[in-house]
Amino acid sequence: MSGRFLVLEGIDGCGKTTQLRHLANWLPRSGLMPEGARLHLTREPGGTALGIALRKLVLHPPGDASPEPLAELLLYAADRAQHVAQLIRPALEQGHWVLSDRFSGSTLAYQGYGRELDLDLIQQLEQIATAGLVPDLTFWLELPVEESLLRRDARSNDRIEAEGVDFLTRVATGFAVLARERSWVPLQADQQVESVSSALESQLKHHFGPLQESMR
């Protein structure tokens, strides 16, 4: 596969969506993408037609029909399997770039550390759902829990975002562990939006600039 797969990860309110929109405009004009390559923007859950339906079930279930933790985990795995097979892998095989708001790291952080489900089980499901696909580069937008809570209070929340501070603290710990273990690129997300955008641009130039590409 000659395309590039980029992922933004982080706790609620870290600014992933804002930075995704910025990169959607910046990357195609950056000179980093090969001629003819397109940029596919996507998210998890919800990157495919099936994923949109699964996203609604997971985040906004009807009435009191919230899925149990294990069922929730399996719904995320189903979304990812469809996402990889239907969108991500085909795009990469055609030489395009894919930029995703969340990927498998979020499942480990939220369902593993947050829900305290078995990490080994989650990693086994990750291998099945992704068929071994690993992002070329993952950015961790690191945000203090206190700031996340402040930002969350200023907007409407889905079922996961409405969880309490203890849950969010465990999730933040999970992201920190994953960033270290998986060599993610950490970026301080409690800066001005423009500063975070500039840091993202610098890192992308560092990893995918002409010199780096010639060494691959």
From Swiss-Prot:
Pfam families named in the record: Thymidylate_kin
Enzyme class: transferase
Gene Ontology BP annotations: dTDP biosynthetic process; dTTP biosynthetic process; dUDP biosynthetic process
Functional note: Phosphorylation of dTMP to form dTDP in both de novo and salvage pathways of dTTP synthesis.
Keywords: ATP-binding, Kinase, Nucleotide biosynthesis, Nucleotide-binding, Transferase
Documented EC number(s): 2.7.4.9
Catalytic reaction annotation: dTMP + ATP = dTDP + ADP
HAMAP family attached to this UniProt entry: Thymidylate_kinase
Gene: tmk
Family designation: Belongs to the thymidylate kinase family.
Binding site for ATP: 10-17
Protein name: Thymidylate kinase
